[in-house]
């Protein structure tokens, strides 16, 4: 499983909140990539080469209830293949984040990220 996030976020708080989960995600076997080609807002997921989820909504109350964002589930092999190709291109334009990278962050940086992570539900 791969997670692609923008290397530069338009919000320092959102970036810190995201990074507060990196160690747990890496421990769970998730491959994290920081995309250098610009800001990514779309959320995409491909499953079993024939199912695709695409949209703008985060899976949180704010996106679903307040912002009225949507995702679309598509059962189509060709669509899923094209989306998978796009996802691969994002990974090619990214830098991988590994456990060594996360453990090299300073105590101050990790404290900041974890403190912001506590308020992530309201960001």
Language-model-detected regions and their locations in the chain:
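PLD/PLD-like phosphodiesterase catalytic module centered on the HKD motif
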Residues: 1-123
């Amino acid at each position: 499983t791969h997670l692609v996030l923008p290397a530069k976020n338009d919000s320092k708080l959102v970036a810190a909140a995201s990074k507060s989960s990196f160690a747990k995600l890496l421990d769970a076997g998730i491959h994290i990539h920081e995309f250098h080609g610009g800001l990514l807002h779309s959320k995409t997921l491909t499953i079993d080469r024939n199912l695709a989820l695409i949209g703008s909504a985060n899976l949180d109350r704010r996106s679903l209830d307040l912002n009225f964002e949507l995702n679309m589930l598509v059962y189509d092999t060709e669509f899923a293949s094209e989306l998978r190709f796009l996802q691969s291109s994002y990974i090619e334009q990214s830098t991988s984040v590994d456990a060594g990278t996360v453990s090299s962050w300073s105590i101050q940086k990790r404290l900041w990220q974890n403190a912001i992570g506590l308020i992530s539900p309201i960001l």
